[in-house]
């Protein structure tokens, strides 16, 4: 594992995507946005807020170029420095904050949403638009994964339909970055995002990777995906 990743809980990869990959992700996202805003939330998840906060998830297999991308050698070059291991795709989704009304997202660890004990995994957050504090960038709380590897207590916020795992005063580090930047952070790293107060949507793509398939320990059922990532030469 990278010493910086271990010490901070995240790594930033500037200019990580080619123009072709960035264009492909934007095209797929925009095509999915043409679907009704009630994008399966009632049956698949309960954290979407319609046009204000959309989660367009688990659709990579519908788009061959995206299907290739999420397990590609290009992804391995991002994931391996963080996990120091082969990896499998665990989950993926586009997250879009609507123009002028895009909802914020409370402090949480991604692991808190899994629902059972599991090894930490990696979230690869990709900016599809230039990301600012005005349009809802991600904020991170640095975390030493060696000394503080656990899952914090979270509380469900019914009004905003989300978990909250931090009630302190630290605003976190804003990940202000141009489109094509990748922020890779541990599923144990606390993060949040602000509201989008601009006149344009803020789009991001999130793919998550684990060193092993994530299974429910009681049933043995696979949680989402376990697609091997191709090792980079």
Predicted regions and their residues:
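Active-site region of the double-stranded beta-helix
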Residues: 85, 109-116, 128-137, 145
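Double-stranded beta-helix
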Residues: 133-192, 210, 214-216, 227, ...
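Conserved hydrophobic/aromatic beta-strand scaffold that supports enzyme active sites
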Residues: 10-12, 123-127, 172-174, 182-184, ...
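Non-heme Fe(II)/2-oxoglutarate
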Residues: 32-47, 156, 182-184, 189-233
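Active-site glycine-rich loop that binds ribose-phosphate moieties when present
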Residues: 105-109, 126, 165
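Short, conserved beta-strand element in jelly-roll/cupin
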Residues: 115-133, 176, 208-213
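Glycine-rich phosphate/pyrophosphate-binding beta-alpha loops
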Residues: 110-112, 121, 192-196
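Non-heme Fe(II)-dependent double-stranded beta-helix
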Residues: 1-8, 14-107, 113-116, 153, ...
């Amino acid at each position: 594992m990278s010493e910086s990743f271990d010490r901070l809980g995240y790594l930033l990869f500037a200019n990580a995507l080619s123009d072709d990959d960035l264009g492909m992700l934007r095209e797929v996202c925009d095509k999915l946005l043409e679907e009704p805003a009630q994008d399966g939330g009632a049956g698949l998840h309960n954290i979407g807020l319609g046009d204000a906060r959309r989660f367009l998830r688990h659709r990579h297999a519908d788009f061959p170029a995206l299907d290739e991308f999420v397990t590609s050698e290009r992804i391995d070059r991002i994931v391996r420095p963080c996990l120091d291991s082969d990896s499998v795709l665990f989950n993926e989704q586009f997250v879009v904050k609507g123009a002028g009304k895009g909802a914020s997202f409370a402090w949480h660890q991604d692991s808190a949403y899994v629902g059972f004990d599991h090894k930490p995994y990696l979230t690869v957050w990709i900016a599809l638009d230039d990301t600012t504090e005005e349009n809802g960038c991600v904020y991170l709380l640095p975390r030493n994964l060696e000394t503080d590897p656990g899952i914090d207590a979270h509380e469900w916020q019914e009004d905003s339909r989300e978990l909250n795992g931090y009630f302190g005063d630290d605003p976190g580090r804003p990940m202000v970055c141009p489109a094509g930047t990748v922020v890779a952070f541990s599923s144990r790293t606390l993060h949040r995002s602000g509201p989008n107060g601009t006149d344009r949507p803020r789009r991001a793509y999130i793919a998550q990777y684990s060193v092993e398939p994530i299974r429910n320990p009681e049933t043995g059922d696979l949680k989402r995906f376990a697609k091997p990532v191709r090792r980079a030469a």
